[in-house]
Amino acid sequence: ASPSVAAFRFHDRHRNCIEAKEAIGREAVTRITEGMTVIIDTGTTTLEVARALPGTGGLRVLTSSLAIASTLFGREGLELVLLGGTVNRGSPDLSGPLTEDNLSSFRADLVFIGTDAFDRDGIFTHSQQIAGVSKRMIAGSRKTILVADSSKCGCNEFVKFAAWDEIDELITDDGLDVGQRVMLRDHAGIPFTMVEVNREQ
């Protein structure tokens, strides 16, 4: 795909469930305390986490996302580390052996992970390359928070990159139905927060 087509696809995904993603981002940053080292995964929901970051607090942020790096560039009170790697076709992010090797040099207090899909069996994405980076991010962080809007629950993607016992918390929105909530509580056994979203047009 051409760069313009790739950008369109990313921004089109970002518009989906935008109110939920913004609300999730605002909730997610309440988990951050001053002086933390935070990894922010690539994705449209994690982009909203980056946008909601406080302007001060002596944070260090690592990311593989060009969109997130662009959002945070020049932000006061924040040290930004852009992980190197190969630019992916179809989305503005970096992956590959260089990205994974760079991640092994860092230890973070917290990682915000995005996903294309989650269900009773775990956390999934469409890309083996992105999965490899996400695994390294989780391995290099003391705490892992999955940020995903409710439309991702029950979706079908073929690359599993994390089991539920690797996730400390899920932040999603109140669009989950009763069965999905029971699945998360009783099968996945994951603490989860559902933010309220105003869906009135």
Positions of the model-derived regions?
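Conserved phosphate- and dinucleotide-binding cores of soluble alpha/beta proteins
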Residues: L66-Q201
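HTH-adjacent hinge/linker in prokaryotic transcriptional regulators
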Residues: A1-T42, A50-G58, L66, F73-G77
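Short charge-dense sequence patches
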Residues: I18-E22, L47-T56, L83-G90, A131-R136
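Conserved helix-loop-beta element of the AMP-binding
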Residues: G58-L59, L170
